[in-house]
Every structure is written in C-alpha cells, then in structure tokens.
Amino acid sequence: MKTEVTEKELKANADNAQNKATLADKIKRVPETVKDYIKKPQVWGFFVSLVVIALLAIAFFHPDASLGNQLRQHDMQQGAAIGQEVKAYMQENPGANEPRWTNSLFSGMPTFQISPSYPSNSLFNWINTLFGAGLPSPSNLLFMMMAGMLIMLLAMKVRWYYALIGAIAWGFSSYFVIIIGAGHIWKFVTLAYIPPTIGGIIMAYRGRWFVGSALAALFAMMQIESNHVQMTYYFLFVILSVIICYIIDAIRRKEYSRFLKATGALAVAAVLAVAANLPSLYNTYKYSKESMRGSHTELTNPNAETESTGGLDRSYITQYSYGCSESFSLLIPNIKGGASAKPVQGSIKPTSLLDVDGAADKVTNLNEGELQYLSQYVSQYFGEPEGTNGPVYVGAIICVLFLLGCFIVRGPLKWALLAMTLMSIMLALGRNMQWFTDLFIDYVPMYSSFRTVESILVIAEFTMPVLAIMALQKLLTTPNAYKKYFRPLCFSFGIVAVICLAGYIAPSLFGSAITENDQYISNMIASQLEYYGYPREAIAQYSINNPAIAQAVSDIRYGMVSADSMRSLLLVLATFAILMLCIKGKIKKSYGVAIIGLLTVLDLYMVDKRYLNHDSFCPPDLSAADPFPLNDNDRQILADTAMNYRVMDIPRFGSAEPSYHHKMIGGYHAAKLTRYQDLIDRHLSHFTSGEDVTQADFNVLDMLNAKYIIAGDNSLMVNPNALGNAWFVNEVKFVDNPDEEMAMLSVIEPDSVAVADKKFQKILASKATTVAPGDTIFETSYTPSSLTYSATSQKGGVAVFSEVYFPWGWEATIDGKPAEIARVNYVLRAIAVPAGHHKIEMRFNPQSVSTTVGIARTAVILIYLLLAGALVAVLLKDK
C-alpha cells in the first residue's frame, strides 16, 4: 500500500513538472506564436483592411479634415447651448464635482440626458481615440464605423477581402454620413460599436467563448457609454435573433454544453458592460419615470391613446414615418428626391428644385414669378416625413446581393437577418403600417419611449450588407457555382433590374410628384396673398395648382427618379456580368472581388457626397467664431447683474439657442419633465400659439421668475410682477388630485397663495401663516446645483421657491439641519421655515450617482482583466 502511494505521488510530481514545463515552453513560444498569427491571411488581411479603410476615411473628408475645417452640426450646437451653463461652471471651478442640474432650459431640469458624464467614464474614454486610429475628425468616425463591421465579419469567419467590402458598404451607407453632417455624433458612435459587440457574441457561440465574451463586454461597454439608448435598444432585436439562431443550431447539433457555456460567459459580459455604465443607465432610467420618455401626464387627458402607450404619444412616435414607396430608397437613392435640406458652412440650407441637374431645360416655358415659386417654395425632396437630410441608401450592389443571399445562403442566421430586415422596414413605415406599429407600442417593452421610427432602418442597413457579403463569399467559393446558382442568380438580379427599369421608364409608379406638404405650403402662401389683397388670378398663378408649375415639378422630380433608377440598373447589370464571368471561370475570382469592391465604393461614395461635401465645412476662422452671437436683447438682459432670473423668449420658445446665454422658461429637449410639459400645454403655450393669453398665464410666468419677456415682435420687456427667487405665502390650499392642482393655478394669486397636493399636507399644513411686515427671503448664492437663501420671519411660514420641483436628489437644510421639500403650484418647491433668521440651502446631490460610479469603476477593471485573460489565452494556446 505504501509503495502504491509513493508511485502515485511520483506520478503526480512528474505530471506537475510536465505541466510547469509546458507552461514555461508556452511563455517562451509567445514571440513565435505572434509571428505565426501575423502570417495567417485573416490576420495580415485585417491590418491591410485597416489601412484601406483609413485611406478611404481620409479621402472622403479630404481636404477638410486635414485642414482643420469643421462641421457646425445643428444637433451639436443645440447640445452646446443647453450644456453651456454646466460647462462654464466647470471651467470656472476646475476640479469641482460636475453639476447634475441646469437652469438653462425649462426653468430647470437634471442633466442626465444633457451632459451625461461621470467620473468612471474616464477609465475607458481613451478607447474612442484608439478606435478612431487617431485620425482627424470626422475621418475618425468613418474609420470607427468600418473597423467595427470588419471585426464582426472576421469573427463570422468571412474571408478578409469579402469582410473589407462589407465594412465599406456598412460605413458608407448614406444614413451614417448624413448623421455626421447633422451632428448626431453619439448616435453614430453607438452604431459604430454595435457590429463588434455582435461579433463577440458570434465568436462566443462558435466555440471561442472566453475571447468572444471579452470582446462583447468591451464593445458593449463602449456602445452603452455613447448614450444613444434608442440605437442600442433597436439592436437588441438583432442580438436576440442571433441568439435564437444559435439555440436552434445547438438543438440541431445537440451541443447543449457549448451553447450554455457561451451563454453564461456572455451573460457575465452583459452584466459587466451594463455595470460599467450604471451611472448613466440607472439615472436615465430613474429620470425617465418623471420625463416625457417614460411617463404620461397625470392630468385627465381626452386622448386615451396617449396614456395607453405608457410613453410618448402615438402621433409623436410616428411623426417621422417612412413612406411605402420611399422604402425603395435602399436601392434607388433619389426615389423621393434625396434631401430637403443640406448642411452648408454651419447652417442648414433648403434644397431648391431648380438646383437639380437638367432642371433648367424643363422650365423654359415658365415666367419669372413661376420660377421664383419653384426656387423658393418647392424642395427637391417629395417623401412623406416633413423633411430629411437625405435618404437611407445601402447601395444597389448590396441590395441585389442581399436578395441573392436570401436564396443561396443556408442556416438559421440567414433567416434572422432576413426577418430583421423585413421587421425594420415595416416598423419604419410607422403610421403607414399602423397595425404593426401598434403591436410594438402596446406589447413590446420600451418601444413607445422612442420617436422617429424611420431611424429603425439602421437595422436593415446592418443586416443587408452582412447577408450580401455572405452571399458573395458563398457564390465565389462554392465549386460548380454556375451550375448550382445560375437560376437564383438570374432570378435575384432580374427582380432588382425590373424594379430599376420600372423606375426609369415609369417613375410615377412610385407615387405622385406633388405631395401634401407641397399643397400645404401652397395654401399658406395663397392665404397670405389673399390677406394682402392680391387678385385671385395672381394667387392662382403663384400656386402648386398652376398647371405649368405642377408640370415642371413633376418633370424635374420624376427626372431625378429616372436618372437614379438607370444608375442603379447599370450597377446591377455590371455586377451580374462580373459575377457570371467569375463563376464561369472567364476571369479570376480575386479580380472579380476587387472590381465589385471598387464599384461598391464608387456607388456609395458618390451618393454620400451629395449630402456631405466640401461646402458643408466651415474654415477654421469661421469655426472659431461664436456660434451664438449676442443680439441687442441679449446684451440688455446680461447687463442685469442679479444672479438668478429667467427669460421668456416667445419667438424662440422651443429653441435651444437662447439657453446658451440665459436661464430660459422654454428650451429644446426631447425628454423634458412631464409636469413641466403639462404647464406648457395648459399655460405657457398660449404665448406662442396665438391663443388668448389670460391673467393666469401671466401668473405662471411670474411664479417662474420670468423677469424678462421677449415679445413676438422681438421687443424686450421687463416684467415688474416677477416674484423673484423665493417668497412667503399667506395660505396653502390642498387639493385631491393633479387636475385640481392645475385648475387652481387659474384661480390663485401665486404671490400670496400656493396650491399643493394633499400628500404634502403633513409638511406644510400647520406652517402657513399670514406674512408679517418685515418677513423676507432672498437668494444669497447660486450655482447650477446649489442654492442658498437668507430668510427672516416673525412667526415662520411657507416659503415658495421659483425652482422646479424634482422628487429625488434635491436635499434641503435650514441652518444645517435637514428640511423636507414639498411641491406646490404643480411644479415649484416649497419649504416650511420656522420663525427667526435662518440660512436655507438646497443641493442637488443624487446619492445614486456616487453609488453607481463605484460599481462602474469595479466593472471596468473587471472587463480589462477579462481582456487581459483573453489575450493571454490566445498567446498561450497550443498550436
């Protein structure tokens, strides 16, 4: 027995020694392993592809990116305006904690969806620079988009040269170039990180669960950090469909263990990615319950549909719906005329119908007035949404290869890609396929939280190139492809060619050239001319209903459709010819792939340049100029040295620009507080809509401390009745529900009476007393998220503050002791103040921020450790 134990010990020691030697050998072999990896075609091909896409990204924005020319994007300017108060505070107070509240818009709101930056983000922000290859902006963005798709296709084991074409097709899809011009940068960056996230998922399910989950965790973390929840949400549908594919595959192969291992690893990756962004996600989620994005008004609403969505109004959700025939823009870019406006040196310039190539030849019979009408009032765009910066065009070559893939590619992934393509197109139709949209609004969680349904076409922009490249590789790598795939090849190309031919011969098949918007504009002009006394004959001539104008509009717009239809047809026929030559062995397949890649680049490159080109950029001197120059009203208002007052700008109530300089009653943000929206609907909108303005409406302005009012004619008025930063009231009236609370605003005099929901009765009921002579309260210091007041009263009382109430995060103290904040007058804060002289402080300090930041830091470190482990596993892997 003793001998047996000794033998076991000796054997174990020998095994351990062998293992140690093996590990040592592996470590010594790392340089050799790296060399072996670099020699692999997929690896060196990856680096070659990176060089190619970098050159393309630089070339597309040449010479502007290298010269330092910049795009003054509209959305970025809006973001700069509403974030200016916080930015200025941080510049004046370096090292201070970033304020989570701003008074720049809507009388005050949290910054969770304005400038969502958290200390934990600094641990991984550098990855954005690395992933952009250090290229100048915006070339770095285009590089990021293509690099992400390249990683995903390589993870799918697509050969590198096919993957390169797919990456280019994805990156140069027109929508992405258009949103760069519009300034939707964080949407763009989110989309750039989605393909490599899915690539990690695919790699995990294909057996490399450790490396795949590490990559998925990294790119999911970066994707979520980019903070465009709508895009992340849409691609959850794609991720779910991919997982379902691998469930089916695991069942068919009976490989349950591998599937469960990958799923478990990916679940950990998902948790880490979410945890790394917990400050943004949690606070956004919590805030959404108080905003238009995630809650509906508590007021009785005659529109029951608004409430049933649990989010945004149905009409608001579907406001920007793609037209049925407009969906063919995926194949024919000018199927609806392209863009209604384009960025030109920092401004948005409407497109004119007379600027279309060949338009001059079609308007020779028009007089000067008719030409003026076409030039000023008729856009090149004639689709259904109110306006657009350009179509969603994935490329004629990609469209036809996608259709081919539907026939020749096998496996569940094909069905997932096809299903997601159809789903995205149907949902993008919005109100034009209301029954389908309603299914998602009513039964799919969170779908009703997002508007601009046409943007879900990003899914089709993703799925179509992926299936197209799978089809191209399948066709050109299958032996006897001519015999196997001749019929589906002819069928696919034939269908697409017929559609293009129809657009060329009979463009009217895709809808009328005269839109409802054209008619609406014409009616508006007619009303104005009639008001100024023009005769009916003159009005009829200056109208879209003028047969000469209508004919010219139809000729020019249908000419655009025909021209682009022929363009797409030629690309389809050229691709068909090249593929036939390849599969029949007439030319080398490598030449065929190169030619198709070149055609894809030229196709998308030329279309993209229609919507973003050299004219879109500002030279450095213009870029450095103040984007929000002061006008006379601004100067007069800013001459007021008081620390905290508000401005009611009636002409620009819904604009972000005034927020750059002032604390505004209005503003622009898609996720404003629901209660404040109620106040706008019931009172503040009367100033901008032309409805009768009542004394109650002015009372609302007074209680919001609107010290300055810019009237409809841009004249500036000082409001002598503005109630200031805080005041004591004689009485608080308690009501049973929000309807009564809102109704009382039309009755009370807010300088002496406040109204509150009865749930605040315990805080305020016994405290309200008649204001005595000498009772005062005034603000002594102000920062965006910290307010200090000095209060003096003989008997104590209820102090009302002209600050927007928010149910969590605000903490109040009286002489350093905690005090409760109540809500009065539907949107304002109130505090019960004891008798005597006191210092009142209010700070916005959400505990959730510090808690979630600590969790996020831990998660980021774990993701880095996971990546390090994955790298070690790759380097030490046995040959």
Would you name each region that the model predicts?
Residues 400, 751-879:
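Active-site-proximal, structured, solvent-exposed surfaces of multi-pass membrane proteins
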Residues 2-774, 778-790, 796-802:
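Conserved luminal/periplasmic juxtamembrane motif of membrane-embedded glycan-processing enzymes
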